[in-house]
Amino acid sequence: METSKSSTMQVSFVCQRCSQPLKLDTSFKILDKVTMQELTAPLVTTAAVKPGDIQEVDSNIEETFAENRTDGVSRRLIPPARMMSTESATSFTLIGEASDGGTMENLSRRLKVTGDLFDIMSGQTDVDHPLCEECTDTLLDQLDTQLNITENECQNYKRCLEILERMNEDDKEKLEAKLKELAEDEERLIQELEEVERNRELVAKDIEKVREEAERLEQEEARYQKEYSEFKRQQLELDDDLKSVENQMRYAQIQLDKLKKTNVFNATFHIWHSGQFGTINNFRLGRLPSVPVEWNEINAAWGQTVLLLHALANKMGLQFQRYRLVPFGNHSYLESLTDKSKELPLYCSGGLRFFWDNKFDHAMVAFLDCVQQFKEEVEKGDTGFCLPYRMDVDKGKIEDTGGSGGSYSIKTQFNSEEQWTKALKFMLTNLKWGLAWVSSQFYNK
């Protein structure tokens, strides 16, 4: 039973360098008083050890070990010799039953002695104990290196001492004469140094005056430099402003020249074609069964067309008869001059109402009438002017005079989408010719 109790006791020391747990050698269990005196003796003895010192060490070893018998756990801390705090970096814990008083007391005493031994060893050297085997080997290597260095120094001192001992009396006299000569040189050099020091003081005063003058000049230079920098900054700002104004004028002149060469009508109204569709500003005018163009796009194209004819008429000073063009985006319309309340919409939303309401057809025929009036007005001043497609306002048709010779209705009722789309394409082509004539008459000049 006692053996099992003893086997439960655990002691743990840690290495003071790497903090790894240590397993102590069995020789620590049989330390006697003579061995303790040998281990704790100083490495270099400068005086005889008094008997009282041995008794003091022995009394430290016999210091009472603190044990808590209520929980069977005894604790002891081993502080390093160079630690200012009373807490230790080395500690161990005894775990066992307090009922076995003799075994616990002997073990506690041995551990206390071991801990005190480590404290004493740490105090005798510059190394904290205990150490593990690897750290001990490293320490031994360092000590060997220091020992070799010390031995080399000792050999050098011995050689110097031997050289001094071999010197004879003549050498001593020569050295004394040399020493006297050096003393005279020293006295002479001291006098020269004093003279140089006096000259240095005079030069220092001159330097101080020159330094004051230099400071004054530096202040004036700094003030002039500051003023120069300010004027330079203002000059750079004015140069930047001047360059900016010149660049703005140059850019404005370039834009002015470009605008002078720009035809407003050509830049604003781009008439072209996309397949079978005539387009104005990329809006398709017309519909096909295979390409059902949205009515919003068709209405927008009509709005651009009305705006173009309205602008051309204003440029020529033309007043249309019977109708007045009202450009209003994708809701543009014509206003009857004979009946002010009658509006002819040039927009449509499709559906069943589109097939029964003929206002949209009347509006397109009225617009064709306005195009015809524009053509006649141009022909008054230029008899050589001719549109590529002849327009029959009474029938609401446009004839392909230069091609198949057929005529195409501009109305949607009782008409196919293909013919209606082709009629609109021919109408846009006539407007493109009218646009080119107005541009040549009013802008190229």
From Swiss-Prot:
Residues 420-445 are annotated as: Required for membrane-association. One of its GO terms (molecular function) is phosphatidylinositol 3-kinase binding. GO terms for biological process: autophagosome assembly; autophagy; cell division; cellular response to nitrogen starvation; defense response to virus; early endosome to late endosome transport; late endosome to vacuole transport; mitophagy. Residues 137-264 form a coiled coil. A motif (BH3) lies at residues 103-122. It is a peripheral membrane protein. Keywords: Antiviral defense, Autophagy, Cell cycle, Cell division, Coiled coil, Cytoplasm, Cytoplasmic vesicle, Endoplasmic reticulum, Endosome, Golgi apparatus, Membrane, Mitochondrion. It is found in: Cytoplasm; Golgi apparatus, trans-Golgi network membrane; Endosome membrane; Endoplasmic reticulum membrane. May be proteolytically processed by caspases; the C-terminal fragment(s) may induce apoptosis. InterPro entries: Atg6/Beclin, Atg6/Beclin_C_sf, Atg6/beclin_CC, Atg6_BARA, BH3_dom. GO terms for cellular component: autophagosome; endoplasmic reticulum membrane; endosome membrane; Golgi apparatus; mitochondrial membrane; phagophore assembly site; phosphatidylinositol 3-kinase complex, class III, type I; phosphatidylinositol 3-kinase complex, class III, type II. Plays a central role in autophagy. Acts as core subunit of different PI3K complex forms that mediate formation of phosphatidylinositol 3-phosphate and are believed to play a role in multiple membrane trafficking pathways: PI3KC3-C1 is involved in initiation of autophagosomes and PI3KC3-C2 in maturation of autophagosomes and endocytosis. Involved in regulation of degradative endocytic trafficking and required for the abscission step in cytokinesis, probably in the context of PI3KC3-C2. Essential for the formation of PI3KC3-C2 but not PI3KC3-C1 PI3K complex forms. Belongs to the beclin family. Component of the PI3K (PI3KC3/PI3K-III/class III phosphatidylinositol 3-kinase) complex. This is Beclin-1.
